[in-house]
Amino acid sequence: MNRAFSRKKDKTWMHTPEALSKHFIPYNAKFLGSTEVEQPKGTEVVRDAVRKLKFARHIKKSEGQKIPKVELQISIYGVKILEPKTKEVQHNCQLHRISFCADDKTDKRIFTFICKDSESNKHLCYVFDSEKCAEEITLTIGQAFDLAYRKFLESGGKDVETRKQIAGLQKRIQDLETENMELKNKVQDLENQLRITQVSAPPAGSMTPKSPSTDIFDMIPFSPISHQSSMPTRNGTQPPPVPSRSTEIKRDLFGAEPFDPFNCGAADFPPDIQSKLDEMQEGFKMGLTLEGTVFCLDPLDSRC
């Protein structure tokens, strides 16, 4: 029987939710390495990976090489693998990418987890050697996944929706900035044309045009028709035509479509952001297998 969350009755969590959600739990271990596996879950899968990396460790040990020590930082956001002294992050395994985690029952020092690589999308099995904390580290990763899973259920997917809204607004801002730059270039071109027209001298013997009348604010009354007809020409070329009114109805003062919060439609997200959101949701749906226990993204009261 699989439940949304279940664990063996003799296993209890040892950390407070605040420790994993607001901070992290550190552990020290030796890093045997990582190797690609064909499946995201399975005892046989990790057993073969452990055997392969143990053999590689013995070869390195016979050559005088030491197994590197690492620090693990476990939280609801994932498992970070750092160099203990410099704190340089070597690997950052996000929780929704971790699908299997177990400690070796035949070797109490060994624990392992399978994580999907963010760049290659291959499943990698990470193997560690911890003298006293192998089982505790495995349970801590399971607790972190459980807390992240419950946080997702409580939010009702609002976190994902919030990220989508932010992505949509960021795209809207980027589009407006692009439009603004294009409009600036158009204004600059019009100013250059106007400057060239103004500096051109009138033909010899021509009469000085009569100054138009002004209003009470000492300004020339605006008339689209008279303005267009009074625009001088140079070398027989006409100034750029004034856009018709029909093309301006759906544009604001700056040439952009007016923003309507009630008619903006569904956001069109950039492919990279959308794929990350879909991948995160799919990772939680797959769940985390912990010592034969499955955490899956189902309603809390469901039964499979």
Swiss-Prot record:
Residue list for modification Phosphothreonine: 16
Protein name as it appears in the record: PTB domain-containing engulfment adapter protein 1
Annotated Polar residues bias: 225-237
UniProt main location, coarse: cytoplasm
Quaternary context: Homodimer. Interacts with clathrin. Interacts with GDP-bound ARF6, but not with GTP-bound ARF6. Part of a complex composed of GULP1, ACAP1 and ARF6. Interacts with ACAP1, LRP1, MEGF10 and STAB2.
Gene3D superfamilies in UniProt: Pleckstrin-homology domain (PH domain)/Phosphotyrosine-binding domain (PTB) (2.30.29.30)
Family listed: Belongs to the ced-6 family.
Coiled-coil annotated spans: 158-202
Signal peptide: none
Gene Ontology CC annotation, any one: cytoplasm
Function: May function as an adapter protein. Required for efficient phagocytosis of apoptotic cells. Modulates cellular glycosphingolipid and cholesterol transport. May play a role in the internalization and endosomal trafficking of various LRP1 ligands, such as PSAP. Increases cellular levels of GTP-bound ARF6.
Span of domain PID: 21-176
Stretches for region Disordered: 223-246
Keywords carried by this UniProt record: Apoptosis, Coiled coil, Cytoplasm, Lipid transport, Phagocytosis, Phosphoprotein, Transport
Residues the record lists as Phosphoserine modifications: 223
Tissues with expression: Widely expressed. Detected in macrophages, pancreas, kidney, skeletal muscle, heart, colon, intestine, lung, placenta and ovary.
Cellular location(s): Cytoplasm
GO BP terms, alphabetized: apoptotic process; lipid transport; phagocytosis, engulfment
Organism of origin: Homo sapiens
Keyword Transport on entry: yes
